[in-house]
């Protein structure tokens, strides 16, 4: 009936059985951006935000979120991640967040990378909202994936 792997022949949702698949090296990178006022960005860069170390807290939040993805996203397998990295890059009025997740396993880590990036962005908002309530989170997307049946993919 459907080509979606999370639906059975009758259209009902189910968790995909990955038991028979071989374990392979897998990696996913995801990212997004949070735009803000110049003042808020300067405070974050200087470590002067009222709530403390914004980027350090956002990094830990992103890593924790990646580890909890199987609990947050229905039908997503709980995974034993080998590594998660959350990196930040400053722009003129924004911070770009890139999260990378990897493992050797039977299913991909795209959702873990996306969850890490989104929660890191949300944490930046939470930690800096006293400085700028009008911050805008945008462009959350998968940037790259490696491994598995579909091979290597890079966003255009």
Curated annotation (Swiss-Prot):
The active site is at 126. Substrate binds at residues 75-77, 111-112. Keywords: Lyase, Molybdenum cofactor biosynthesis. Its EC number is 4.6.1.17. The keyword Lyase applies. InterPro entries: MoaC, MoaC_bact/euk, MoaC_sf, MoCo_biosynth_MoaA/MoaC, Mopterin_CF_biosynth-C_dom. One of its GO terms (molecular function) is cyclic pyranopterin monophosphate synthase activity. It catalyses: (8S)-3',8-cyclo-7,8-dihydroguanosine 5'-triphosphate = cyclic pyranopterin phosphate + diphosphate. The keyword Lyase applies. Pfam families: MoaC (PF01967). GO terms for biological process: Mo-molybdopterin cofactor biosynthetic process. Pathway: Cofactor biosynthesis; molybdopterin biosynthesis. Catalyzes the conversion of (8S)-3',8-cyclo-7,8-dihydroguanosine 5'-triphosphate to cyclic pyranopterin monophosphate (cPMP). PANTHER family: CYCLIC PYRANOPTERIN MONOPHOSPHATE SYNTHASE, MOLYBDOPTERIN COFACTOR SYNTHESIS PROTEIN A. Homohexamer; trimer of dimers. Belongs to the MoaC family. This is Cyclic pyranopterin monophosphate synthase. The gene is moaC.
């Amino acid at each position: 009936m459907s080509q979606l792997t999370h639906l059975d022949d009758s259209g009902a949702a189910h968790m995909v059985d990955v038991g028979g698949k071989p374990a392979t090296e897998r990696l996913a990178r995801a990212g997004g951006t949070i735009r803000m006022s110049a003042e808020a960005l300067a405070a974050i860069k200087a470590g002067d935000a009222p709530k403390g170390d914004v980027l350090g807290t956002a990094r830990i939040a992103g890593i924790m979120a990646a580890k909890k993805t199987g609990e947050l996203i229905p039908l997503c397998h709980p995974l034993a991640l080998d590594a998660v990295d959350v990196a930040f890059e400053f722009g003129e009025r924004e911070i770009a967040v890139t999260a990378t997740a990897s493992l050797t396993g039977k299913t991909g880590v795209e959702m873990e990378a996306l969850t890490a990036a989104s929660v890191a962005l949300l944490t930046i908002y939470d930690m800096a909202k006293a400085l700028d309530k009008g911050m805008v989170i945008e462009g959350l997307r998968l940037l790259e994936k490696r491994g598995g049946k579909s091979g290597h993919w890079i966003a255009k």
